[in-house]
């Protein structure tokens, strides 16, 4: 049996993605065991983040400044805008180091089952940004799911009157992927998106 403080720590940790009750218990134990080197610095970092991190008013990214460092970076290509579902998608794109434009975070995907409609997402601000003559291409980087593709099609329709090229990420075989390990949908998408050598 553990005290209420540790139990609360375990319960809160178990709410994090990828941490179930058992993993949360192990993480809490490690934090308590390494109080000075882990728990105290983590608590301070979390308090700092809670106090300072905000949502960028331009793109929807999280940062301690507004506009965020990406939006404020004049070295980035202002003609390209990448539309992502959420900040995790933005961070994934940034991790690759291959996209040098700017972003628009939708804040979710259209989902009739979950009651998420166009008015719940950042589509209107995206359309307003698309009217900027400096923007020439908008890349829809939504997930290859039913909701992701539905959202991409809806956004593409909304952007049709704007004077921009709307493109989407290619779908298909990942680098290093073997065909016998892929699902039918991925193989079909790869076949449709094939290219000439």
Swiss-Prot record:
Listed Pfam families: RecR_C, RecR_HhH, RecR_ZnF, Toprim_4
PROSITE patterns: RECR, TOPRIM
Residue ranges of the TM segments: none
Matches recorded under SMART domains: TOPRIM
Coiled-coil segments on the chain, per record: none
Disulfide bond sites: none
InterPro entries (UniProt xref): DNA_Rcmb_RecR, Rcmb_RecR, Rcmb_RecR_Znf, TOPRIM_dom, TOPRIM_RecR
UniProt keyword list: DNA damage, DNA recombination, DNA repair, Metal-binding, Zinc, Zinc-finger
Annotated signal peptide: none
Toprim domain mapped to chain residues: 79-174
Annotated GO MF terms: DNA binding; zinc ion binding
Role description: May play a role in DNA repair. It seems to be involved in an RecBC-independent recombinational process of DNA repair. It may act with RecF and RecO.
Protein family: Belongs to the RecR family.
Protein name: Recombination protein RecR
Organism: Paramagnetospirillum magneticum (strain ATCC 700264 / AMB-1) (Magnetospirillum magneticum)
């Amino acid at each position: 049996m553990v005290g209420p403080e540790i139990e609360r720590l375990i319960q809160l940790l178990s709410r994090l993605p990828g941490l179930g009750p058992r993993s949360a218990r192990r993480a809490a134990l490690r934090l308590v065991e390494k109080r000075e080197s882990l728990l105290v610095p983590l608590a301070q970092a979390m308090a700092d983040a809670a106090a300072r991190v905000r949502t960028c008013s331009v793109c929807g990214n999280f940062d301690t400044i507004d506009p965020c460092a990406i939006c404020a970076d004049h070295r980035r290509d202002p003609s390209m805008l990448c539309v992502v579902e959420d900040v995790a998608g933005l961070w994934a794109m940034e991790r690759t180091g291959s996209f040098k434009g700017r972003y628009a975070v939708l804040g979710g995907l259209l989902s009739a089952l979950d009651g998420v409609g166009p008015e719940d997402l950042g589509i209107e601000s995206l359309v307003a940004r698309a009217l900027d003559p400096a923007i020439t291409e908008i890349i829809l980087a939504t997930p290859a799911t039913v909701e992701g593709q539905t959202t991409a099609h809806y956004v593409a329709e909304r952007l049709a009157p704007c004077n921009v090229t709307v493109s989407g990420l290619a779908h298909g075989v990942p680098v290093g992927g073997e065909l016998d390990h892929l699902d039918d949908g991925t193989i079909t998408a790869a076949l449709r998106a094939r290219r000439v050598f």
